[in-house]
Regions:
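S-adenosylmethionine
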Residues: 1-316
Length: 316
């Protein structure tokens, strides 16, 4: 991606320059760079030190990450990260720093019943299984059969044993399994503006009309997730985009449509989290949306743009 290609999509250019105002250049500089790769060391397969030792011996240079002890930024790699024996046997997962965060915020515990409503290809599912020490149950759902194959491969490769794969439209879970899950991750399909460095094709198809279609999916998924949550249960809604229409607007929609939604605050060591918006253009959102968090690439070098809302369903 370069600045010219963004300028060629006038709708996108107008949105980003309007949204970021004085930070527009800084945002573009960061988001169009492909971030350094990061890996999550998989303790379901071996202990951390064993895995690190094997990688360091081969000449990998790794840097610790403040917010998660099993994540490392790859400063130098002698071979492609996907081409090592260690990758093949599931000792690590190549995962962006931002995408490690929704599972950490959701914090599933061993023994809980968890739903990942749009889970393929499985970075967050396999991370949650690791956090749960392969105990309890994860229902990993996706509607796209091609992506489900990748999900199944990753679950297998990473030694995940506590996960059931379902191929169902996510918006049906609330009706099929009301008040069933302790924790739910709604990592919604989105316009991916936070990942332009990795997904330059977004610039070609991004439009207001496309956002409208995505919003319909996002609304149905957040309602379905909330309905499938037990009273007292915890849900995370996340996207890798920056548009308020796909983020704060969707959480605000849930607050309008359902009683008993509490937005919770959270912090992460070493990550600069920006507060959620309470207004955007002609839209006014509920005040508690300030507790939602944005990860802005220009404030967090090496991170992609991300949005995360942590919510609790009040005990009935």
């Amino acid at each position: 991606v370069n600045i010219e290609s963004i300028k060629n999509n006038s709708e996108l250019f107008r949105f980003l320059s309007n949204f970021y105002e004085g930070d527009f250049e800084a945002f573009l500089d960061c988001v169009i760079k492909k971030p350094k790769s990061a890996i999550r060391v998989n303790t379901l397969k071996a202990n951390k030190d064993t895995i690190l030792e094997r990688l360091l011996k081969q000449g990998f240079k790794l840097k610790k990450v403040a917010f998660y002890e099993y994540a490392f930024v790859v400063e130098e790699s002698p071979v492609e990260l996907g081409n090592t024996v260690e990758h093949f046997v599931g000792y690590y997962y190549v995962q962006s720093l931002s995408s490690l965060i929704p599972p950490l915020v959701l914090a599933p515990q061993p023994g809980e019943v968890v739903l990942d409503i749009a889970s393929a290809p499985g970075s967050k599912t396999t991370q949650m299984a690791q956090m749960m020490e392969n105990r309890g149950v994860i229902v990993a759902n996706d509607v796209d059969i091609k992506r489900v194959k990748a999900l199944a491969n990753n679950i297998d490769r990473m030694g995940v044993l506590n996960t059931i794969i379902t191929i169902e439209q996510g918006h049906k879970f609330g009706k099929l399994y009301p008040e069933t899950f302790d924790k739910i991750l709604v990592d919604a399909p989105c316009s991916a503006l936070g990942t332009l460095g990795k997904n330059p094709e977004v610039v070609k198809w991004w439009s207001r009309e496309k956002i409208g279609r995505l919003m319909a999916t996002q609304k149905s998924l957040i309602l379905s997730g909330f309905d499938a949550l037990k009273p007292g249960g915890i849900m995370v809604y996340s996207t890798c985009t920056v548009t308020p229409e796909e983020n704060e607007y969707i959480v605000n929609y849930l607050l309008q449509e359902r009683e008993g939604v509490e937005i919770l605050d959270f912090h992460l060591p070493g990550v600069k989290l920006t507060s959620g918006l309470t207004e955007w253009e002609r839209l006014i959102f509920k005040k508690e949306l300030v507790k939602c968090k944005r990860i802005e690439p220009h404030l967090n070098p090496g991170f992609e743009g991300f949005f995360i809302a942590l919510m609790r369903k009040s005990p009935s």
